[in-house]
């Protein structure tokens, strides 16, 4: 049972990178619609109607608002704290608490994925062009499903490893008694 928890180090490093990028994204200001319009004017693509450009601007602005909401900021900060706490537990070789803390992080990430999905569906409703709305809706669903599946796989891996550790510990105790 003295194996090193490499799986948890890998998961925590990936989670730390995600948390850091989320924290940096949160620190940036919400762009104004005028800034988005000027950026869209510079990237004007042939065959794109004015309504599609306006839909894209409204969608982008709403997504930026959602990503800077108090609930989302609280999720990001709490996630970063949980990752740091799990790393501290792992450094101190308290694997059980590190696992529990990481499970909390993953559950929080799943809540964040659900919140992001609901927010993106709200933003999609601002799009008037039916083709664009359908494309954005499918894209947001695919991203949300992907993130949820990844988080569930991480959760399953941690639960499996915790089960194996408990089983090995029980076998060691049985051998000591015998």
Q: Each PLM stretch: what is its role?
A:
Residues 1-12, 62-72, 92-102, 134-144:
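Membrane-water interface of alpha-helical transmembrane segments
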Residues 12-24, 78-83, 109-112:
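Canonical alpha-helical transmembrane segments of integral membrane proteins
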Residues 33-69, 115-144:
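Interfacial non-cytosolic loop connecting adjacent transmembrane helices
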Residues 134-178:
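Terminal transmembrane helical module of multi-pass membrane proteins
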């Amino acid at each position: 049972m003295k194996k090193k928890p490499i799986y948890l180090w890998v998961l925590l490093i990936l989670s730390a990178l995600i948390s850091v990028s989320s924290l940096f994204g949160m620190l940036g200001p919400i762009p104004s619609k005028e800034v988005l319009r000027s950026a869209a004017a510079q990237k004007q693509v042939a065959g794109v109607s004015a309504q599609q450009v306006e839909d894209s601007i409204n969608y982008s602005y709403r997504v930026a608002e959602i990503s800077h909401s108090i609930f989302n900021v609280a999720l990001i900060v709490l996630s970063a704290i949980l990752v740091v706490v799990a790393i501290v537990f792992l450094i101190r070789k308290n694997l059980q608490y590190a696992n529990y803390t990481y499970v909390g992080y993953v559950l929080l990430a799943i809540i964040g994925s659900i919140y992001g999905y609901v927010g993106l569906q709200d933003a999609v409703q601002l799009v008037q062009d039916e083709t664009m709305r359908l494309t954005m809706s499918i894209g947001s669903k695919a991203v949300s499903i992907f993130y949820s599946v990844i988080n569930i796989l991480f959760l399953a891996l941690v639960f499996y490893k915790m089960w194996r550790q408990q089983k090995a510990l029980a076998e060691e105790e049985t051998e000591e008694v015998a």
